[in-house]
C-alpha cells in the first residue's frame, strides 16, 4: 500500500472518529424532543433544523441511518466553514475538536470567538483552553456540555 492510499484511509478513519465522537456527545432520538428546558426542539444526532432549513417540530421523526448520513454531511460542511476563519495549520485532532465545537455552538459563534483569535496568532494552547469556556447554557454550566468540552479540549491537545 502506497503512502497516498494510507493517508486517504487515515483521513477516512479520522472522519469516522469525528462522526462517532459527535454522535456520542449528541446522543440519538428518533422523535423530536427538547434536550433541556429552554432549548430548541431537537431530533436525531442533535439537529434543530430539518434538511430544508426549517425548524424541527414536535412529531418529526428520523431513522438512525438518516441521522448518521446527515451528521456526516453536516460535519463536513462545518469543517469547510470553520476552515475559512482558521488561518493557521492545525492537527487532525484540533480540526476534529473545533468541528465538534462549531457543530454545537454554530460557525458564526466559533469564527467570532476568542478561540479563533488566539489560534490565528499561533496560540494553540490558548485556543484549546478556550474550548472549556463554552460549557454554559442560559448562563449556567451544564454537566453534559462540561463533559463534552473536556473531551474536545483533550482532543485539541492531541
Regions found by a protein language model. Give the residues of each.
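Long, amphipathic alpha-helical surface segments
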Residues: 1-39, 47-54, 62-73, 79, ...
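Active-site-proximal beta-strand/loop segments in catalytic clefts of secreted hydrolases
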Residues: 26, 44-46, 101-103
Amino acid at each position: 500500500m502506497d503512502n497516498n492510499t494510507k493517508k486517504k484511509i487515515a483521513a477516512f478513519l479520522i472522519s469516522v472518529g469525528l462522526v462517532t465522537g459527535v454522535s456520542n456527545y449528541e446522543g440519538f432520538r428518533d422523535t423530536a424532543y427538547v434536550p433541556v428546558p429552554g432549548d430548541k426542539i431537537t431530533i436525531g444526532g442533535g439537529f434543530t433544523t430539518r434538511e430544508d432549513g426549517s425548524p424541527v417540530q414536535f412529531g418529526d421523526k428520523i431513522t438512525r441511518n438518516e441521522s448518521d448520513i446527515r451528521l456526516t454531511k453536516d460535519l463536513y460542511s462545518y469543517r469547510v466553514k470553520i476552515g475559512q476563519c482558521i488561518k493557521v495549520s492545525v492537527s487532525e485532532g484540533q480540526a476534529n475538536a473545533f468541528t465538534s465545537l462549531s457543530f454545537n455552538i454554530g460557525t458564526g459563534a466559533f469564527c467570532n470567538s476568542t478561540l479563533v483569535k488566539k489560534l490565528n496568532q499561533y496560540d494553540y494552547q490558548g485556543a484549546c483552553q478556550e474550548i472549556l469556556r463554552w460549557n454554559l447554557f442560559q448562563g449556567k454550566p451544564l454537566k453534559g456540555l462540561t463533559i463534552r468540552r473536556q473531551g474536545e479540549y483533550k482532543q485539541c491537545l492531541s
